[in-house]
């Protein structure tokens, strides 16, 4: 009986974890931090900015299924933890 109860507890924990969704920062540049729950399948947070802007960098943040490719003079950083793209 104890084994059955333990098995049910473990199965419940595993099933609850399957519904996990990522949360990322989504603000543009230096706006106050905002967060977004990412859609299913988007399990990465990203932060992208242009490397050579004379009067400070403009940052773009959000969720992604795959790390976005950096364009010319652009830097992209991706991570796989909640709110890791600040």
From Swiss-Prot:
Tissue specificity as recorded in UniProt: Expressed by the venom gland.
Signal peptide: 1-21
Residues that span the membrane, as ranges: none
Subunit relationships: Monomer.
The keyword Secreted belongs to this UniProt entry's keyword annotation: yes
Top-rank lineage group of the source organism: Eukaryota
Protein name: Muscarinic toxin 38
GO cellular component: extracellular region
Task of the protein: Binds to the muscarinic acetylcholine receptor (CHRM).
Disulphide-bridged cysteine pairs: 24-45, 38-63, 67-78, 79-84
Subcellular location field: Secreted
Broad class of where this protein is predominantly found: secreted
Family listed: Belongs to the three-finger toxin family. Short-chain subfamily. Aminergic toxin sub-subfamily.
Keywords tagged on the record: Disulfide bond, G-protein coupled acetylcholine receptor impairing toxin, G-protein coupled receptor impairing toxin, Neurotoxin, Postsynaptic neurotoxin, Secreted, Signal, Toxin
Organism annotation: Ophiophagus hannah
One Pfam family, short name: Toxin_cobra-type
Database matches in InterPro entries: Cytotoxin_Cobra, Snake_3FTx, Snake_toxin-like_sf, Snake_toxin_con_site, Toxin_cobra-type
One of the record's GO molecular function terms: toxin activity
């Amino acid at each position: 009986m104890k084994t059955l109860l333990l098995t049910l507890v473990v199965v419940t924990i595993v099933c609850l974890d399957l519904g996990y969704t990522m949360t990322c920062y989504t603000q543009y540049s230096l706006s106050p931090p905002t967060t977004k729950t990412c859609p299913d399948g988007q399990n990465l947070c990203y932060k992208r900015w242009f490397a050579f802007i004379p009067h400070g960098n403009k940052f773009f943040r959000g969720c992604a299924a795959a790390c976005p490719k950096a364009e010319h003079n652009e830097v992209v950083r991706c991570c796989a933890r909640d709110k890791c793209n600040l």
